[in-house]
Amino acid sequence: MTAKMLHLVRYKFPSLEPASLFLIPGSFLQERFRRDILHRAVIYEADNDRQGTASSKRRNEITCSGRKLYRQKGTGHARVGDASSPIRRGGAKSHGPKPRDFSTKLQTQVYNLAMRIALSTRFINNELTILENPINLSQPKTRILLEVLKQHKLGHEYGKALFVLNDNYFEDESLKNNNLLLASRQLGYHCSFIPVGEFQVRDALKFGKLFIDSEAMSLIVEKFAQRNTLSDMDQPASLTAYVDANSSSFTKSKPEPSLSL
């Protein structure tokens, strides 16, 4: 059985003009909204991100004498013990935190489904855009990137934009030579750039607009798509079909909602 393919329009950056078509499994961005699945995935990510390193001193860890501070009777006040008592200044912390592991477990299929649901929700709401590689600016100027964001109604005023790029963009040499990443260092209030290896379900949900480059999207599809969907495909998820923007088979008019954003 041959899996149906979904044709997504891929856009150039920073002009956001249609450039070519990008093929993914048809069911990948058509998952039904499930709030319970998303909740489980977000809690799972938050639990695993907790460091669990908080540590306070108990009574046996306080450096002080074990001598009783006052005699038991005759003072007219409540009886007291030694200086390590939790009710005294400089004393121990009663029932305080100790290093522990907060991580929880979640089935891989459930987490993969949550990622597909999150991306499907952004796709249905026209908040997901696929970008064509390479992604760069003419100059490493913050002013230029800010003008691009305002031109396309992006940024804090319209919802912070998230750019998910291939891990190669964040290597030492690429990071120094990429004008886009250099220009974005002072615009954390308006946009964020993360490698696809750090992309989580929370990231797909909390940002106003989501931009993913085609190479990163191929990795996401390969990792989170259903196994039977990938095995039934005639072509691998990373294979793309280029279409000349000037040809009759591709128009620059607004694409249909069922095909692209």
UniProtKB/Swiss-Prot annotation:
Function: Component of the mitochondrial ribosome (mitoribosome), a dedicated translation machinery responsible for the synthesis of mitochondrial genome-encoded proteins, including at least some of the essential transmembrane subunits of the mitochondrial respiratory chain. The mitoribosomes are attached to the mitochondrial inner membrane and translation products are cotranslationally integrated into the membrane.
Location of the protein in the cell: Mitochondrion
UniProt transit peptide range: 1-35
Cross-referenced SUPFAM superfamilies: Ribosomal protein L4
Chief location of this protein within or outside the cell: mitochondrion
GO cellular component: mitochondrial large ribosomal subunit; mitochondrion
Region named Disordered: 72-101
Quaternary organization: Component of the mitochondrial large ribosomal subunit (mt-LSU). Mature yeast 74S mitochondrial ribosomes consist of a small (37S) and a large (54S) subunit. The 37S small subunit contains a 15S ribosomal RNA (15S mt-rRNA) and at least 32 different proteins. The 54S large subunit contains a 21S rRNA (21S mt-rRNA) and at least 45 different proteins.
Family, per entry: Belongs to the universal ribosomal protein uL4 family.
Official protein name in the record: Large ribosomal subunit protein uL4m
Naturally occurring in which organism (per UniProt): Schizosaccharomyces pombe (strain 972 / ATCC 24843) (Fission yeast)
Keywords: Mitochondrion, Ribonucleoprotein, Ribosomal protein, Transit peptide
